[in-house]
Amino acid sequence: MFHRERQLIDGERISIIPNILSADECQQLIARAEESGFKLSPPSGGGHGRTHREDPRTNEYTVINDQSLADKLFKRVSPLLPPTLEWMADNAYFTKGIGGREWSIVGCVDRLRFYKYKKDEEYPEHMDGSYSRTITYNNELQQSYKQHSFLTLLIYLNDDFQGGETKFFPDKQHCRFLRDIENKQPVHVIKPKQGMALINIHNILHEGSKVQSGIKYVLRTDILYQKITELHPKLEKYSQKNSNNNDKIIVTEWEKHFEPSCKMYHD
């Protein structure tokens, strides 16, 4: 049993937790991802013009939907994470005057993304996309919640390679133009270590640096927070129709959200 502590790199915005996974667990996940089959990552893009760039993202990826693994990861990291988002600056998802206090930590996205970087592969500057959905619990209260991810959970599955650091860059009000982020020096550099978790807010500019030798494997999911919400009448009908004695009813599928002012986004 590992003793786990979270180390703050930039307040709550960036932190690391060593030994979230053991070496054996990491190797098992690499094998599972390889068995699932990697494919070339799609081009990434963003910006107000929504133009895609074909050149920067050269890694491979695979997606495994696994609620039990997502729950396992959440059980390990959640005791070390903020229970609410009170610390986070107000944004479009917060009610004015309340901030993040109405959001409480609830789980990890079950859409687990595995990424594989070979020699000379990288992922230049980008911001992370987020996920959201609406659920309702099939109990006496029939309470509905809006779930939204605000934090990225990235786990390094190996460290027997050179390069591949995660670098964070200075804040920029907008990164609409390429010149806004070129030639920036990183303010934080995270060296990969097997089994270590990196947690960061989605809307912070960072990169996965070029792998110099070897192969780099990482696992990404997202930390979900939820708040009470009122269902649209059409969703209420869906909820009633699909109750079927389940503990919870997924009212909407996962929706992806990307920072519109950033030239790069990351799923």
State where each predicted segment sits:
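Fe(II)/2-oxoglutarate oxygenase catalytic core
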Residues: 1-197, 203-267
